[in-house]
């Protein structure tokens, strides 16, 4: 019998906190064979990422402490190897894709410079050959007009495009083992399918092992040969994928398999006047060229979107990465310039200047996809949630603000006693609740939710959806829900707009669009979900 490519043997990892060591991974044993995929599954905080980061000793020590066990690659210990040995393995033989692309991409450098650095360091390639390889790899991961996009900076790409660039960067080294930590979380279903197909193709081509960390069980069904399920730092089940998915033995695994979003949107209040009316919304960014950076053309990213939204109603914006979903949200918030009419509660917003918009701002709030980016790590929860009150209700005393913060924390399911903690001390689901509380404290009429559940595991996702529905019924909130997860959209939204490259492909009542889609692109999205 051939030895495994990667063997994790009885690994235990903890974090030192003052005089104590808190264990986070407890006696984990896993194997990844060449040419096979092991899916590591579990909810937020289960120890998946700590296990993955330990393979290349990427955890800072201290505070991380390796308590017992070993990690072997081709039979050789990585855990106890010299730093020089590990440096030779990192990138060359074992590559890693992280969940948040902005952590891995340098905002100050173009894509070409960052990709070229990988090829020159790890494969010794130079100018023209390296450029051809870069363009080919970007094409393979679905970046349109790859040769032109090489000049772009990370901030000029959509979230999904940044994720694809990061995957391309890891694959350029042609590694023997690829560790992928939630690499498709931010991607729409069509791009997700494309990336999974690419990973399978590269596995066959390179006989590459793949450790795939995810909370998305539909991906596990499509990709994994074996599955290990983690809970509270322990591996509770480890079997071949077909066996585990058809006949799970552990109650936690059974719970995960039954946690897909279900249910219907909340009932609509009758006889409501429109809260938001949007007519022919259009967003175009200038294309500048030459030394003087003169505008030579415009790139239309959102074109001719119209809809009406009532109190207590949810509109879903669906489409692949770069389709204009988030840009539409930014335009409605008046954070970027747009054309067309935006009427909020009878008042036209498109003619108001910044000062005139201020009284309206507290009534339109936003919750972003990644709470790690949207919550200031230097502020505690009390300071984060009360920030809007300081701007919009400056006459409130500190005690009054704190009382409101405690009340809204209870409303979103957070313990008010934790208000003096910092974001890093909370799980992903708890951080998203903090973001919802920050929006809710200003008593808005409309909340724009930009992929608020895509980075959360299924069990936490279900809890956040239940919270959003409860708040919607209680406060008659209107939502604009931006998502690529069609299961979530169907469970929450009353009407839906399907976008592709800034154009409306299909629009209508959610149930009608899902049960009888009229357009081929909508049918394709539904088939892939």
Question: How should each PLM-predicted stretch be described?
Answer:
Residues 64, 78-95, 113, 121, ...:
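ABC ATPase NBD coupling module
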Residues 66-77, 340-349, 360:
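Conserved ABC transporter NBD signature motif
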Residues 129-148, 399-417:
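Conserved ABC ATPase "signature" region
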Residues 152-157, 161, 422-426, 430:
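Conserved ABC ATPase signature
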Residues 172-176, 441-445:
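A short, proline-enriched helix->beta-strand linker immediately N-terminal to the Walker B motif
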Residues 220-222, 489-491:
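A short, surface-exposed alpha-helical micro-motif characterized by mixed small hydrophobic
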Residues 235-239, 247, 504-508:
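ABC ATPase "signature
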